[in-house]
């Protein structure tokens, strides 16, 4: 086996590298080329990048394509640009907008990995005769019986496992992540050593297809109904004011709600059907149980084989937080997760990712998208009562 756990000598092993134009994927290409692999660089043009071509911190924009091409020339590897714009719009941008219209908080990076990078690009890599597809993600993979498993990376600050939970077993077996054992400073140092022009390039930020980070503009253009005005209602039923579209709000939001109040108020629920933004005290956000859809289970054995009393593991519902103790249950086709410590501000559409433990070497057990959450009994009762009321215009 070679350094990528593949049979054969590196020079007889073709690897397609997904090159975004950033320092991480560039270093992956450089490392594999230096080891003697037959490396082919591929960059995807994913969206109409005119507004983001020269925006600092953008991803997959025109400048990124140029950077990937220059790095490939420096390394002496072939490089191809594939136009996936239409596919990206249908698989990522449109569902992103539809999710917001439904009052959810989507994570487009997960959808992109699941439906474009690790599906279409992977198929392209196989068509090119590649033995594996390598990316610059900070995550590790390793042998696990006859297959491979995902593990958190050495650099916890760069952990991208949250965005890769939907990767299927077949995809994991074909993918390689050479940066999983490195820190970001080490990666930049390697780029400097190799003389790559992207060594000091700023990391991509926010959502790649949203110019200036204003996702509400994109959603309003694609789904005008999301900008329809409606009521801002207290969880106790009082109408406090009006809003200019639920797309401007997210669960847990405090600032910019647009109403004056003598108490701190947070967005606790988005009622898309009634174009209603529900606000309340912080305690109304507390959640101890969530239900998942589109579950991707990467543990050993079928999901249905977990113990009747549940499986103790660790979970995280935000990419920036460490995994916390939880219990996974699967009953009659319904997947739920009980959070031992509770969480605030959980929104439908977000991901819940499962792990073996909370350490840097934790195995990734997959996860799912949050369908709904259970609040405290009082908050649940108030939301149920409020849902039965029709929308109303506040008194002048």
Swiss-Prot record:
CDD domains: MnmA_TRMU-like (cd01998)
Source organism: Mesorhizobium japonicum (strain LMG 29417 / CECT 9101 / MAFF 303099) (Mesorhizobium loti (strain MAFF 303099))
Annotated family: Belongs to the MnmA/TRMU family.
A Pfam family reported for this protein in Swiss-Prot or TrEMBL: tRNA_Me_trans_M
Function field: Catalyzes the 2-thiolation of uridine at the wobble position (U34) of tRNA, leading to the formation of s(2)U34.
Protein name per Swiss-Prot or TrEMBL: tRNA-specific 2-thiouridylase MnmA
Family annotation (NCBIfam families): PRK00143.1, trmU
Site entry (Interaction with tRNA), positions: 137, 350
Listed InterPro entries: MnmA-like, MnmA-like_C, MnmA-like_central, MnmA-like_central_sf, Rossmann-like_a/b/a_fold
GO BP, sorted A to Z: tRNA wobble position uridine thiolation
Binding site for ATP: 18-25, 44, 136
Gene encoding the protein: mnmA
Assigned keywords, A-Z: ATP-binding, Cytoplasm, Disulfide bond, Nucleotide-binding, RNA-binding, Transferase, tRNA processing, tRNA-binding
Reaction equations catalysed: S-sulfanyl-L-cysteinyl-[protein] + uridine(34) in tRNA + AH2 + ATP = 2-thiouridine(34) in tRNA + L-cysteinyl-[protein] + A + AMP + diphosphate + H(+)
Record-listed E.C. numbers: 2.8.1.13
Keyword Ubl conjugation: no
Residue positions of the active site: 112, 208
């Amino acid at each position: 086996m070679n350094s990528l756990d593949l049979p054969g000598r590196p020079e007889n092993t073709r690897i397609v590298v997904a090159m975004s134009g950033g320092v991480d994927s560039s270093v992956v290409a450089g490392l594999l080329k230096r080891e003697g692999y037959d490396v082919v660089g591929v960059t995807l043009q994913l969206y109409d990048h005119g507004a983001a071509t020269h925006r600092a911190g953008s991803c997959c924009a025109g400048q990124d394509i140029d950077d990937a091409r220059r790095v490939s020339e420096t390394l002496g590897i072939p490089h191809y640009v594939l136009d996936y714009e239409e596919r990206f719009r249908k698989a990522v941008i449109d569902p992103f907008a539809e999710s917001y219209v439904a009052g959810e908080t989507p994570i487009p990076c997960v959808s992109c990995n699941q439906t474009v990078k690790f599906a279409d690009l992977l198929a392209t890599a196989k068509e090119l005769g590649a033995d594996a597809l390598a990316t610059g993600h900070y995550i590790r993979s390793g042998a696990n019986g006859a297959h491979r498993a995902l593990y958190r990376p050495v650099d916890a600050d760069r952990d991208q496992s949250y965005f890769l939970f939907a990767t299927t077993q077949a995809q994991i077996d074909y993918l390689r992540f050479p940066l999983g054992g490195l820190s970001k400073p080490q990666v930049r140092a390697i780029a400097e050593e190799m003389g790559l022009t992207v060594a000091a390039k700023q990391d991509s930020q926010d959502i790649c297809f949203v110019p200036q980070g204003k996702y509400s503009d994109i959603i309003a253009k694609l789904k005008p109904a999301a900008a329809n005005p409606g009521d801002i209602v207290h969880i106790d039923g009082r109408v406090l004011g009006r809003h200019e579209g639920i797309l401007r709000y997210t669960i847990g939001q405090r600032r910019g709600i647009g109403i004056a109040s003598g108490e701190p108020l947070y967005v606790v629920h988005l009622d898309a059907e009634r174009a209603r933004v529900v606000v309340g005290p912080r305690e109304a956000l507390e959640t101890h149980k969530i239900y998942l859809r589109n579950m991707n289970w990467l543990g050993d054995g079928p999901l249905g084989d977990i113990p009747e009393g549940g499986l103790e593991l660790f979970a995280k519902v935000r990419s920036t937080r460490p995994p916390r103790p939880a219990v996974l249950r699967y009953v009659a086709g319904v997947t739920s997760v009980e959070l031992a410590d509770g969480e605030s501000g959980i929104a439908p559409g977000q991901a819940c990712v499962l792990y073996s433990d909370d350490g840097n070497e934790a195995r990734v057990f997959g996860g799912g998208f949050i369908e709904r959450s259970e609040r405290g009994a009082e908050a649940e009762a108030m939301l149920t009562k409020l849902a039965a009321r029709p929308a109303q215009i506040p008194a002048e």
